[in-house]
Amino acid sequence: MKKKLAIYFALLSSVFVAVSCSSSEEELYELSPYAMVKSFRIGNIRSSYPSFTSTGEDTLVVRTVSMESFGFTIDQVSGRIYNNDSLPYATNVSRVVTSFSVDGVLSIYVDSLDSYEYMATTDSIDFTSPRKLRVYAADAQYYKDYTVSVNVHQVEPEMMVWNRYQAVEGVSPVRAVELAGRMYLFGTDADGAPVVAIAATESEPDWSVSAVSGLPAGADLGTVQLFRDIFYAVADGDVYSSVDGIVWSFASAGAGAAAIVGASDVDGKLWIAGEQGIYSSENGSEFTFSESLPVDFPLYGISLASYPLNHNKNIIRYMLVGYANEDKSGEPEVWSRLSTEGKWTNYKNEDNKYACPALKGLAVVRYDGFLYAIGGAGKVSGFDVEAFKSFYISKDNGIAWKTATGFYQRLPKELFGSNVPFAVTVDSNNFMWIINSGSDGAVWKGIINRLGFERK
């Protein structure tokens, strides 16, 4: 399709000379002095994209990406032509069919020839790197240069990327909580004594391990929660607090509390529950009775979250997932409460085919606006599942839980089948932390690429 521009202009001039000679002497024909790209678009692209098989093996699938939603901007001042919305990750742009509308004659710079060569307005072009175009006016007295870039995501926005760091030596994880840019990992040492490991969240974790003091013997570190930048836990039916996670002190008689079941700085409430009922506090030391303990209300193996409603940021939703029995057997319970309501609501429905998964060590965190459940081996929708095989995600605030089927949001393969204590949390920089122990223990930090983009 490419021809020497000189030949093209010579032919173009001869056409106009011929027209002039066959017309009356009073008729004049002028070649256009304009040179510009008026519109640009590309055709649909068929490419191979990463995916995975039903058994979890990596594979490729071929699909066609429609270009209708990817418009191009033509900046006539700078001469740049580009798409604001990048094409999907892994899209092949080595042979792209184009469609130009121009005033003038279009040419493209060819590196191997070190010159601009004529091109048709519907040629296919390699856009793996920006291409230089030049539009000559038909009278060959003027030209304008353009640079065309077809932007493609260099990383898959929806991919969850994991980094592995060394395990926290000598600590069996129970609960992980972030405060002021530091991660606090509560657990036990080899003798079963309570300890806390602390590390900065921004860099590779460098853990400092300290013995926990001030809590009664046998205190359940799984009850630790954060409220108004202070750590709280329940032990022997009472409430204890700590400003540094290391030294703890008595905060309030907890009316036989067995667990902290809700905490929200926005709503200004800390919730505890036990056989005597559910209580709330605004300062962590004075608790007010709210309601009697409902049947099947979870008190053990607690995971909780609190967040504003999408349609009204002034209303806080409390989510609570756990077990009503101390041995944490059977199906987990899912309860919720709005800050404007007076009672907690049980989400259990015997007809629900997508109930919360019953996993060993079940942990639930809120991530990317949804609830993520992970854990050891167990049952999901009545079927046996391996430990850490998948995320189970609820997009309707805890009612339906479905296996994450997307190729990109997967747990690290190294965790598959793991059967050791672990702790899970999400930090303020959108990283999910999974900390496990044992001979293959590690600290995993994962993030969906898109959430990392939003930080920049």
What are these regions (language model features)?
Residues 22-174:
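Predominantly extracytoplasmic/ectodomain segments of secreted and cell-surface proteins
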Residues 168-177, 213-228, 253-268, 294-313, ...:
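Repeated scaffold domains used in trafficking and secretory/extracellular systems
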Residues 197-202, 241-243, 280-282, 337-338, ...:
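Conserved Ser/Thr-centered positions that define the repeating blades of beta-propeller domains
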Residues 165-191:
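Beta-strand-rich domains and repeat architectures in extracellular enzymes and scaffolds
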Residues 140, 188-193, 277-279, 323-329, ...:
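Short glycine/acidic-enriched loop and turn motifs that connect beta-strands
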Residues 415-456:
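Blade-level signature of beta-propeller repeat domains, shared across WD40, Kelch, NHL, RCC1
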